[in-house]
Design a protein with these regions (language model features):
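Active-site segments of SGNH/GDSL-like serine hydrolases
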Residues: 28-34, 38, 61-96, 113
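Conserved SGNH/GDSL esterase-like catalytic core that processes O-acyl groups on lipids
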Residues: 1-55
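Second-shell loop/turn segments in exported
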Residues: 1-4, 15, 45-54, 64, ...
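Extracytoplasmic/secreted proteins, especially bacterial periplasmic and envelope-associated proteins
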Residues: 8, 12, 24, 48-51, ...
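A short small-residue
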Residues: 39-44, 78-79, 134-138
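Catalytic His-Asp segment of secreted/periplasmic serine-dependent ester chemistry enzymes
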Residues: 81-171
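Loop/turn elements at helix/coil->beta-strand transitions in domains of secreted/extracellular proteins
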Residues: 20-25, 68-75, 105-108
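A generic secondary-structure signal
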Residues: 12-16, 62-66, 100, 160
Length: 171
């Protein structure tokens, strides 16, 4: 979202959604967005500064608008805890913006931040998989997931989706 090619990527998203016409859209973005911006005057804008947050919110709204017009059920997945403390703090701040924008746009926000933390709330590459066995869930970079981690991540999204589908059946 924070790349210099944002508008190009949004046109590609619009084109893709026009072709596919999905009923459900699941979105997870953010790790690559932890970069400073350049203001129109060329100065660096620090990550998580008020100006950065405002621009991040604007770009999220633009992306969400593209998805919203398709009348699909949208599940926006927040960032998990990250290994480096500064990265984890930035991820939490970004999740605040994502959650706010998702709620304002009528999307379901899926919070997974603490689901990949240890009992003390700190990053751990290990945790229970879907069977309860403790396994490596995160890659060596402290950001990405292993296969078991991806399955656990998908489980949290599936849980929200199933709950909404069951509620829709009941209504």
């Amino acid at each position: 979202v924070m790349s210099g090619e944002f508008e190009v990527k949004m046109r590609e998203l619009d084109d893709g959604l026009a072709l596919d016409k999905p009923n459900v859209v699941i979105v997870m973005i953010g790790e690559d967005d932890r970069v400073p911006l350049k203001s129109s005057s060329g100065r660096k804008v620090a990550i998580m500064s008020p100006e950065w947050r405002a621009e991040y919110a604007r770009r999220l709204d633009r992306m969400m608008k593209s998805v919203k017009v398709k009348n699909a059920g949208v599940y926006w997945v927040g960032l998990p805890i990250l290994a480096r403390n500064d990265a984890a703090a930035q991820a939490q701040g970004m999740n605040e913006v994502i959650r706010e924008r998702a709620n304002l746009n009528g999307f379901r926000y899926v919070d997974v931040f603490s689901s990949f933390a240890d009992e003390a709330g700190l990053y751990s590459a290990y945790g229970p998989d879907l069977t309860g066995k403790v396994r490596v869930l995160r890659g060596g970079d402290g950001v990405h997931f292993t296969e078991a981690g991806n399955q656990k991540l998908a489980h949290f999204v599936e849980k929200e989706l199933r709950r909404d589908l069951n509620q829709a059946k009941a209504d």
